[in-house]
Amino acid sequence: MNPDNPLLALRDKISAVDKKLLTLLAERRLLAVEVAQAKLATHRPIRDVERERALLENLIVLGKAHNLDAHYITRLFQLVIEDSVLTQQALLQKNLNHPHAHAARIAFLGPKGSYSHLAARNYASRHFDSMVECGCLKFHDIIKQVENGVADYAVMPIENTSSGSINDVYDLLQQTSLSIVGELTLPIDHCVLVNGPTDLQQIETVYSHPQPFQQCSQFINRFPHWKIEYTESTAAAMEKVAALNSPKVAALGSEAGGELYQLQVLERNLANQQQNHTRFIVLARKAIEVSDQVPAKTTLIMATGQQAGALVDALLVLRQHNLIMSKLESRPINGNPWEEMFYIDVQGNLQSERMQQALQELQTMTRSLKVLGCYPSENVVPAEPGR
């Protein structure tokens, strides 16, 4: 407390309240683990959307008694519920596949501070007690680390809401024997990171991975005098700027990553789209089993015949079995000009009867068909309170 400065005194009080909130959030997460254990014993689904909706409606009523806005309460507790769902999913999956795994070696793109590094840490924090970090220079190196047994898991970006699909990763999925065992989505907030006092006009050279430059192209175009230099990762760009120690250079990357290199944020929120997220996939040498208590996603890769309507016919099989396709991506087949492979994300468990029936039908009408993996879906669509 600082009685001589009323503003500082109030901030001290706010900090004290924030600490209490953190303690309560941690306590709530522990209760979510107990709920997951109870559901494991009774084989009940992880999600109960009606219960979530009723919870939100009750909290809105309670919030009004404290003059708290309904929209504020809804947004806040949708995040809390999402954390609870993902925590419970992770516990069920660990119990089913790796009940005794406490540490994992995870390969990712770049040194510490890259977005892939942050995604790997997020995944490990939910699924393991600790993580051994295996930073790599290229996507190909990440795959090889796991294939050769140097790492247990690969965390790789697959698509971004602003710049679209990451084709290099899709192409590697054609060639690897690894299976997709998980996914996660990371909010991306690109910043201009500098080593000391400077301004945007004084900067001459900006370093980053090609993806941030694509995602922030509208902001970048405002400074035509900037020289753009590509690096293997955002973390490599931060490392470079930290080493150069010049007011004329900057990096595009995350604030959390910049802190690891003692860089300062000069500008935030650079992306063309306000909602900028990257979806990452997690790969391992062995496929996993997904509990039928958990929402699942299955990723397929297939090549259809060259006749007209072949792809449409294949997709109709999914529709006939009430399977929802959430992603369709095409990539050229190496060595076969004008021929394409199709990557399909389907909402559903590989072991379900309808998925098995659909795969049997697809097998007879495609030139090749491969399941890349079945894994828990981490896209938690928030429940909405009744109007």
From Swiss-Prot:
GO MF, one annotated term: prephenate dehydratase activity
Pathway where this protein functions: Amino-acid biosynthesis; L-phenylalanine biosynthesis; phenylpyruvate from prephenate: step 1/1; Metabolic intermediate biosynthesis; prephenate biosynthesis; prephenate from chorismate: step 1/1
Catalytic activity: chorismate = prephenate; prephenate + H(+) = 3-phenylpyruvate + CO2 + H2O
Domain Prephenate dehydratase span(s) in chain numbering: 105-285
Record domain ACT: where: 299-376
Binding site for substrate: R11, R28, K39, D48, E52, S84, Q88
GO CC annotation, single: cytoplasm
Keyword field: Amino-acid biosynthesis, Aromatic amino acid biosynthesis, Cytoplasm, Isomerase, Lyase, Multifunctional enzyme, Phenylalanine biosynthesis
Keyword Isomerase: yes
Site (Essential for prephenate dehydratase activity): T278
InterPro entries reported for this sequence: ACT-like_dom_sf, ACT_dom, Chor_mutase/pphenate_deHydtase, Chorismate_II_sf, CM_dom_sf, CM_II_prokaryot, CM_P_1, Preph_deHydtase
E.C. numbers: 5.4.99.5, 4.2.1.51
Lyase among keywords: yes
GO process terms (BP): chorismate metabolic process; L-phenylalanine biosynthetic process
Top-rank lineage group of the source organism: Bacteria
Compartments in which it is found: Cytoplasm
Domain called Chorismate mutase: residue spans: 1-92
Signal peptide: none
NCBIfam families cross-referenced by the UniProt entry: CM_P_1, PRK10622.1, PRK11898.1
Role of this protein: Catalyzes the Claisen rearrangement of chorismate to prephenate and the decarboxylation/dehydration of prephenate to phenylpyruvate.
The protein's name: Bifunctional chorismate mutase/prephenate dehydratase
Organism: Enterobacter agglomerans
Species lineage: Bacteria, Pseudomonadati, Pseudomonadota, Gammaproteobacteria, Enterobacterales
